[in-house]
Amino acid sequence: MNATVKCTLLIILGVEIIIGCLGNGFIAVVNIMDWAKRRKISLVDQIFTALAISRLAFVWSLLTVLFTSELYSALMTTRKVLIIFNNSWTVINHFNIWLATCLSIFYFLMIANFSNSIFLSLRWRVKTVVSVTLLMSLLLLFVNVLVINTFIVISVDVYKVNTSYSSHSDNNIHISRIFLFTNTIFTFIPFSVTLTIFLLLIFSLWTHLKNMQHNAKDSRDPSTTAHIKALQMMVTFLLLYTIFFLALVMQSSKMKFLSSTVFNYFFEVISLAFPSGHSCVLILGNSKLRQTFISTVWWLKSSFNAAELPGP
């Protein structure tokens, strides 16, 4: 039974890796080619490109850790390897999460309708707001890495004192839980920001529709359409984000059955669903990416049909 479940999870994992690489690679290539052609790039395209690159790195880092832990499990007990892997994953995951949060902030400032002077000031300085948010997040990244490295050093030193097999296994589980628990705490901050933005967008849409009804105007104006489109993307993003966050919470818990190999693969599948699935949402939600994707599909279809035609 476990072998069947494990095989199924590996197939799903493989599909997610392919989707993640193709989807995020597509976003990065399209925006970089457009940048090279126009000699300029908009703020939202900058965020899209950086997010796509960070998610490509996330997919490959997760794949590297998975293969290393399966094939060279002894390496995962050394301090140097643990620090390299954990720090790499922490940094990549940090930018993956915070760039997505910055994208939410950008959409909120550009779409929401509030007459508050502070909000209007932030809207006019949206590029500065995004830049400052990323810079401030680096402080959290520094603290996150510092805490994780401290726990790794302490845990490895304890393991060296007691080198029995059971202590080796327990120590690996302990390090993993500390690592995941720490990342869960630091992931909760951008998650809270994104959730707040989502609620504010709903409130903005509600007040906008209320004003439209009061003025007896058509509710299907450009602002309403933009609100609904942004909320649709945010709902999907929040759903994937919530699943990813809950997976971190469960992995960092002390329930022993969650330490089994099958559950480890299950959590890997959940972790990859966020960067892989959200890339598809971004492509479908962005007009330039969507049109380029459709054109690419039609070109590939035409090329395939032409190749199948028999020669004279």
UniProtKB/Swiss-Prot annotation:
CDD domains linked to this entry: 7tm_TAS2R14-like
Compartmental location: Membrane
Topological relation to the membrane, as annotated: Multi-pass membrane protein
Tissue: Expressed in subsets of taste receptor cells of the tongue and palate epithelium and exclusively in gustducin-positive cells. Expressed in 15% taste bud cells in circumvallate and foliate papillae but only in 2% in fungiform papillae.
UniProt keyword terms in alphabetical order: G-protein coupled receptor, Glycoprotein, Membrane, Receptor, Sensory transduction, Taste, Transducer, Transmembrane, Transmembrane helix
Keyword presence, Secreted: no
Cytoplasmic side: 31-46, 112-133, 206-229, 286-312
Transmembrane segments: 10-30, 47-67, 91-111, 134-154, 185-205, 230-250, 265-285
Gene Ontology CC: one annotated term: membrane
Keyword Secreted on entry: no
InterPro entries (UniProt xref): TAS2R (IPR007960)
Principal localisation: membrane
Ranges facing Extracellular side: 1-9, 68-90, 155-184, 251-264
Glycosylation sites: 2, 86, 162
Gene Ontology biological process terms in this record: detection of chemical stimulus involved in sensory perception of bitter taste
A Pfam family per the record: TAS2R
Molecular function GO terms recorded: bitter taste receptor activity; G protein-coupled receptor activity; taste receptor activity
Additional remark text: Most taste cells may be activated by a limited number of bitter compounds; individual taste cells can discriminate among bitter stimuli.
Family, similarity comment: Belongs to the G-protein coupled receptor T2R family.
PANTHER family: TASTE RECEPTOR TYPE 2, TASTE RECEPTOR TYPE 2 MEMBER 14
Role summary: Receptor that may play a role in the perception of bitterness and is gustducin-linked. May play a role in sensing the chemical composition of the gastrointestinal content. The activity of this receptor may stimulate alpha gustducin, mediate PLC-beta-2 activation and lead to the gating of TRPM5.
Protein name (record): Taste receptor type 2 member 140
Organism field: Mus musculus
Top-level taxonomy: Eukaryota, Metazoa, Chordata, Craniata, Vertebrata
